């Protein structure tokens, strides 16, 4: 009878052979995961040393997580790996890799408290290993941020910045500073954000010797700076930063630029990347779309959205990263608002449906949870623009109740105010205007939204025939809009001011207001202002007995109205129109046989936000998107 040798040398040979076989089966085309797992499982029959056993359990967990749906078995192997590795010295890679993977697994099963507890313990144990300490701090702060525990996330990032500084890792310190600035921006801690951005900016300029890392950090810094200004509605102020950002991303995307692996692979403490350059490229498109939309350049916003969506589809074919779905939803949310400004509401509801599909495709409905309030708000705008006011009101109320974002709440409330104005609900209107005024008096909100608030008050005063009060509010709106080149707000204010002057018989001032309003509206283009302005022009030309110009203005007004009616007909016939009845839970799945929603071609067809007869311009109100 032969005896199997159990000498250390022969055991090592068995381990190496089995690991080699496991890797062979894993990398086969197609992978043979069953045999890979069998090879790894066979290692345990040799009663390997603790470190080999822990590493093998980790490998089993990695394979099961990556290639199977057997979450429970993956968890058991990772928990065994952790229980063996936790007390062992000089075994950091296996120990902390296991902790990191276990946290990811807990998140997959929606147990974020377990993930946080696991990472907190790992952070505590990793204090003598700067690389793992910082990596685990970033992972833990990300989970807290996802759970909207922003103060905890910010504190962890501050600890990371200190750890990086103590280790002399300047690049890593700046990453922590910028990440913390991003969290503080979400918390609307304006002064703290500015202080952090200034501090990080000085380090980037003076203390990052590697030019490629410097350019990369500059892109991160400029993205945050642009987002900071846009969040405050400072569309004009942001222009130099946005231009600089666009130039920096072109530098990084140039063919001769080194790969991310080359730039960040030389030093362990530099192996941290906020986003790979291909994703940064999409992000720069996204902030450019946001700027174009806020500035009132709808054609530009459409053009950049289509380019960004094309780039996202290319990246998804290479590797379908979850952040690409986030980018896609945000882009669709922006383009939906552009479509409605231009009067293409049937296209808008298609793209709302496309955003819904992206959200529903993400596991555990995580993306839907984060964007449900925005979708309700968009459907509210669509319902409002197609004169389904009861549906619009309910959608905005759902949005207000679901969201924790102050600006989104203000945005929805302003549109609710317009609905109450249209439907002559004076008590509800007063209540909402008082609430908005109280909530935003002592806080620094977006200049665009506060300008919108003054506009709604001006509109309210106009409908009470308080023309002096209306002029006062609208001049305040114009002052804010002109200061930051908020073209759409400017055109809306001018056309309403024109109507105020028309109502008090001052035709000269009315003409002085409506002329630039129409010029801006055609540049945007904003069908709502064009419809309203053409009606005012028709009346002004009739008063001055200019029959030719009166006829032209009337023809334009009829054209806008007919486009509106045609688009309205398409809207109510669309299967996606059913979304106006979604008020809770998962949105209904709707489909149109002719639908190609992802990347859509701009259309020149226009309509307006409410069905109006050409003879009734006074009922036109507009919306705030």
Curated annotation (Swiss-Prot):
Keywords, ordered alphabetically: Cell cycle, Cell division, Chromosome partition, Mitosis, Nucleus, Repeat, TPR repeat
GO biological process: cell division; chromosome segregation; maintenance of mitotic sister chromatid cohesion
Name under which the protein is recorded: MAU2 chromatid cohesion factor homolog
Segments of this protein annotated with the region Disordered: 600-625
UniProt similarity note: Belongs to the SCC4/mau-2 family.
GO cellular component terms, semicolon-separated: chromatin; nucleoplasm; nucleus; SMC loading complex
Keyword Cell cycle attributed: yes
InterPro entries: MAU2, TPR-like_helical_dom_sf
Biased composition (Polar residues): 600-611
Main location: nucleus
UniProt cross-references to PANTHER family, sorted A to Z: MAU2 CHROMATID COHESION FACTOR HOMOLOG
Role: Required for association of the cohesin complex with chromatin during interphase. Plays a role in sister chromatid cohesion and normal progression through prometaphase.
Listed Low complexity bias regions: 612-625
Compartment(s): Nucleus, Nucleoplasm
TPR repeats, residue ranges: 96-129, 451-484, 491-524
Species of provenance: Drosophila mojavensis
Lineage: Eukaryota, Metazoa, Ecdysozoa, Arthropoda, Hexapoda
Oligomeric and partner information: Interacts with Nipped-B to form the cohesin loading complex.
Pfam families: Cohesin_load
């Amino acid at each position: 009878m032969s005896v199997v040798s159990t000498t250390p040398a022969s055991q090592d040979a068995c381990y190496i052979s089995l690991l080699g076989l496991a890797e062979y089966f894993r990398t086969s085309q197609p992978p043979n995961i069953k045999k890979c797992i069998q090879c790894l499982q066979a290692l345990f029959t040799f009663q390997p040393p603790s470190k080999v056993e822990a590493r093998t359990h980790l490998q089993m967990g990695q394979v099961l997580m990556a290639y199977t749906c057997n979450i429970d078995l993956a968890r058991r192997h990772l928990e065994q790996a952790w229980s063996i590795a936790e007390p062992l010295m000089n075994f950091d890679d296996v120990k902390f890799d296991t902790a990191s993977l276990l946290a990811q697994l807990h998140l997959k099963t929606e147990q974020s408290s377990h993930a946080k507890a696991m990472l907190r313990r790992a952070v505590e144990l990793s204090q003598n290993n700067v690389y793992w300490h910082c990596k685990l701090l970033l992972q833990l702060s990300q989970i807290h941020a996802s759970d909207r525990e922003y103060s905890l996330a910010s504190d962890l990032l501050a600890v990371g910045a200190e750890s990086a500084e103590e280790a002399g890792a300047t690049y890593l310190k700046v990453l922590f500073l910028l990440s913390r600035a991003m969290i503080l921006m979400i918390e609307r801690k304006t002064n703290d954000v500015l202080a952090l951005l200034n501090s990080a900016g000085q380090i980037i300029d003076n203390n990052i010797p590697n030019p490629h890392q410097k350019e990369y950090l500059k892109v991160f810094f400029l993205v945050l700076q642009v987002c900071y200004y846009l969040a405050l509605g400072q569309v004009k102020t942001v222009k130099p930063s946005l231009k600089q950002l666009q130039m920096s991303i072109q530098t990084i995307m140039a063919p001769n630029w080194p790969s991310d692996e080359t730039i960040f692979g030389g030093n362990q403490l530099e192996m941290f990347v906020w986003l790979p350059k291909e994703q940064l490229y999409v992000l720069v498109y996204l902030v450019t779309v946001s700027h174009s939309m806020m500035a009132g350049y709808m054609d530009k916003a459409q053009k950049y959205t289509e380019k960004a969506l094309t780039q996202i589809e290319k990246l998804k074919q290479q590797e379908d990263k979850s952040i690409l779905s986030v980018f896609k939803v945000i882009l669709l949310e922006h383009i939906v608002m552009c479509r409605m400004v231009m009067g293409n509401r049937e296209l808008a509801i298609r793209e709302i449906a496309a955003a819904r599909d992206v959200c529903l495709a993400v596991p555990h409905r995580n993306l839907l949870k984060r964007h449900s309030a925005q979708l309700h708000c968009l459907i509210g705008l669509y319902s409002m623009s197609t004169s389904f006011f009861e549906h619009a009101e309910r959608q905005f109320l759902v949005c207000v109740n679901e969201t924790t974002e102050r600006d989104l709440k203000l945005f929805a409330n302003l549109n609710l105010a317009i609905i109450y104005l249209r439907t002559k609900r004076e008590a509800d209107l007063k209540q909402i205007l008082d609430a908005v005024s109280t909530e935003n008096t002592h806080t620094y909100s977006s200049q665009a939204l506060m300008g919108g608030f003054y506009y709604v008050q001006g509109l309210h005063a106009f409908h009470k025939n308080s023309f002096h009060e209306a002029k006062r509010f609208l001049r305040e709106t114009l002052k804010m809009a002109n200061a930051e080149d908020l073209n759409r707000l400017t055109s809306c204010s001018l056309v309403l001011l024109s109507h105020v002057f028309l109502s008090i018989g001052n035709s000269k001032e009315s003409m002085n207001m409506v002329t630039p309003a129409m010029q801006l509206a055609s540049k945007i283009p904003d069908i709502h202002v064009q419809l309203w302005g053409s009606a005012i022009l028709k009346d002004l030309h009739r008063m001055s007995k200019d029959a030719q110009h009166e006829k032209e203005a009337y023809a334009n007004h009829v054209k806008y109205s007919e486009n509106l009616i045609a688009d309205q007909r398409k809207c109510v016939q669309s299967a996606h129109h059913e979304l106006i009845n979604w008020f809770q839970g998962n949105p209904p799945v709707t489909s149109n046989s002719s639908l190609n929603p992802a990347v859509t071609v701009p259309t020149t067809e226009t309509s307006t936000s409410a069905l109006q007869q050409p003879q009734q311009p006074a009922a036109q109100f507009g919306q705030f998107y």
